[in-house]
Regions:
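Cys/His-rich short segments
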Residues: 160, 165-203
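Helicase motor core with emphasis on the C-terminal RecA-like subdomain
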Residues: 1-151, 159, 186-188, 193-196
Length: 203
């Protein structure tokens, strides 16, 4: 499960998130990236904001017709688009080896989902930056979404969310936490490739 070339970072999500993302993309200009959002509405909005800032981005979600979706996929693979803003519908069966960054605009619903989505970066063994924006408000929003679902489903959903939140709030090596979640032991004290190892938080 260890992907040594992936860099994991969690940033606080503030009202300047769009500006933060634009700055990040411009600093990585010409590189391919995927930005995951939880809602289709946010996917559309963010893609428009990026386009207005002269970033070659396109939206992708299950509500679009299949010909638009496959055209977007093809253009991404052929490097005609730099950035895909997507719901988690994107990426199944997409094997673009040189995706250089994966950004989570919203906290993922589970660590397994997070691992799969971040895993789309750096498949060629090159650089892969995995940046997640996190706020406790997001967490409350997701918990609200679950109301009205069967109790058992709510319980599982909450537990998965709590695990993701604990990961986001932790000051421990992110690689160690992820591998531990999948039942693997990571013996190094410092992976040298996550925010917590490179910039330890003051306890």
């Amino acid at each position: 499960f260890n992907r040594p070339n992936l860099y994991y970072e969690v940033r606080p999500k503030t009202k300047n998130i769009d500006r933060d993302i634009i700055k990040f993309i411009k600093a990585n200009s010409g590189k391919s990236g995927i930005i995951y959002c939880l809602s289709r509405k946010k996917v559309e909005e963010l893609a428009e904001i990026l386009q207005a800032n002269e970033i070659n981005a396109r939206p992708y979600h299950a509500g679009m017709d299949s010909s638009t979706r496959s055209a977007t996929q093809d253009d991404f693979l052929m490097e005609k688009i730099d950035v895909i803003v997507a719901t988690i519908a994107f990426g199944m069966g997409i094997d673009k080896p040189d995706v250089r960054y994966v950004i989570h605009y919203d906290i993922p619903k589970s660590l397994e989902g997070y691992y799969q989505e971040t895993g789309r970066a750096g498949r060629d063994g090159g650089e892969g930056l995995c940046i997640t924006f996190y706020s406790s408000k997001d967490l409350q929003k997701l918990e609200k979404f679950m109301e009205g679902k069967p109790v058992a489903e709510q319980d599982i959903g909450r537990q998965l969310l709590q695990e993701t939140a604990a990961y986001a709030e932790s000051s421990v090596c992110r690689r160690k936490l992820l591998l531990h979640y999948f039942g693997e032991i990571y013996t190094e004290d410092n992976c040298g490739n996550c925010d917590n190892c490179l910039n330890p938080k003051k306890q």
